[in-house]
Amino acid sequence: MQIAAYERTWIEGLNRGDVSVADNVFASDCVIHINGSPERNLSLDGFKQMMSGLVAAFPDLHITIEDQITAGDKVATRWVAVGTNSAALGNVPATGRQVRVDGLILDRVVEGRVVERWEQWDQMGMMQQLGLA
């Protein structure tokens, strides 16, 4: 599989609400760096837990890959996510509002698995669209 396909597989899984796809895409010992996360470096289990919460809060979540670039063992992906907050997000009740969020991911792929990820997305913009900031 070409390295850009790993991110497409992950996003297709999220669009179906299937976070378990992560087990086929990420190495079990991968490290995930996400801006604004209380834990700057998440394990795969921590990442899946976080993403499960997002998928539950935005059950109609749809992510579109806008651009991808590969170089060596890395793939950069620019994405846009759209979804309606129809369930609680952590301890915050659902707002019923739709959001559009932009983000960037840089994955390093080794032996067919993502071993490290750097992810940046507009968390403040999402909070503003939800009326929470």
Positions of the model-derived regions?
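C-terminal and inter-domain tail/linker signature
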Residues: M1-A133
